[in-house]
């Protein structure tokens, strides 16, 4: 409980910084899970640079973009009723999620030094599967998130659930 209270105080004092650092940290955890549990690399074969890339993506892309999106979404659809939550989820999953994945996957490719042609081929190959997999997890999570969770905690809640999602995204983004 002390850790949670410290997190709440930090979030109240520095909401943007804490949200971005939370996203980066949990993206890194997701990559470590991907490398160790999914890919079974072992500690000797763990790619620390890849984990750092995912942390950087979390801090520099996921945290700011998703955190900013939640603010925009709350401005576009103010309110916390079930109907408001449903509208937010539909806009999030119908508009934001496809665009986010369409940016995230090529960004990982760029950071991994892929050529534009290889990156485009990888996006065409991986995007449909990633988007379909997104729809298995996120609509229910986001519906609950938009209905039950205050705005300043949404990114943290999503990133906690996203540890599994980040593991999947890291695995998907690093298949060559």
Swiss-Prot record:
Keywords: Deafness, Membrane, Mitochondrion, Mitochondrion inner membrane, Transmembrane, Transmembrane helix. It is a multi-pass membrane protein. GO terms for cellular component: mitochondrial inner membrane; mitochondrion; peroxisome. GO terms for molecular function: channel activity. Disruption phenotype: Mice lack expression of this protein resulting in the development of adult onset nephrotic syndrome and chronic renal failure. They also develop severe morphological degeneration of the inner ear. In the inner ear, mice lacking Mpv17 display degenerative changes of the cochlear structures already at the age of 2 months. The degenerative changes are patchy arranged throughout the entire length of the cochlea and involved the organ of Corti as well as the stria vascularis epithelia with alterations of the basement membrane of the capillaries. The record marks 92 as: Determines ion selectivity. High levels in heart, kidney, and brain, intermediate levels in testis, and low levels in liver and spleen. GO terms for biological process: cellular response to reactive oxygen species; glomerular basement membrane development; inner ear development; reactive oxygen species metabolic process; regulation of mitochondrial DNA metabolic process; regulation of reactive oxygen species metabolic process. The chain crosses the membrane at residues 18-38, 53-73, 94-114, 131-151. It is found in: Mitochondrion inner membrane. Belongs to the peroxisomal membrane protein PXMP2/4 family. Non-selective channel that modulates the membrane potential under normal conditions and oxidative stress, and is involved in mitochondrial homeostasis. Involved in mitochondrial deoxynucleoside triphosphates (dNTP) pool homeostasis and mitochondrial DNA (mtDNA) maintenance. May be involved in the regulation of reactive oxygen species metabolism and the control of oxidative phosphorylation. This is Mitochondrial inner membrane protein Mpv17. It comes from Mus musculus (Mouse). The lineage of its organism: Eukaryota, Metazoa, Chordata, Craniata, Vertebrata. The gene is Mpv17.
